[in-house]
């Protein structure tokens, strides 16, 4: 399962704005390389997996106590999470060690920005 999350003031940790998707046919993400993308606009972020849009998160979808993370400096995290409240602690079925292989990361900007 692939998760795309936005964390910011008022929605950190387990309270992030999140969307997720899986591959068709029960295929595992770990079986091959994939293209993950996030397109950022001032008022929304679109998440893609292998060029397929799977979620759009917008400033308008925030709860009143939340602030839009992208009105402030921000950063990208790529990780394999283990333990804690999410996704949960490993058990006897958990295979270690694990690795996340990243072939490349690209950042683009609209012309003139």
Region roles according to the model:
Residues 1-113:
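GH16 jelly-roll
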């Amino acid at each position: 399962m692939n998760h795309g999350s936005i964390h910011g003031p008022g929605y950190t940790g387990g309270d992030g704005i999140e969307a997720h998707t899986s591959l068709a046919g029960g295929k595992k993400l770990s079986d091959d390389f994939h293209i993950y993308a996030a397109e950022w606009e001032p008022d929304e972020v679109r998440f893609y997996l292998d060029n397929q849009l799977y979620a759009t998160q917008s400033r308008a979808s925030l709860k009143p106590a939340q602030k839009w993370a992208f009105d402030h400096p921000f950063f990208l995290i790529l990780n394999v999470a283990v333990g804690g409240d999410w996704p949960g602690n490993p058990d006897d079925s958990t295979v270690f060690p694990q690795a996340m292989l990243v072939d490349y990361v690209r950042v683009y900007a609209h012309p003139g920005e």
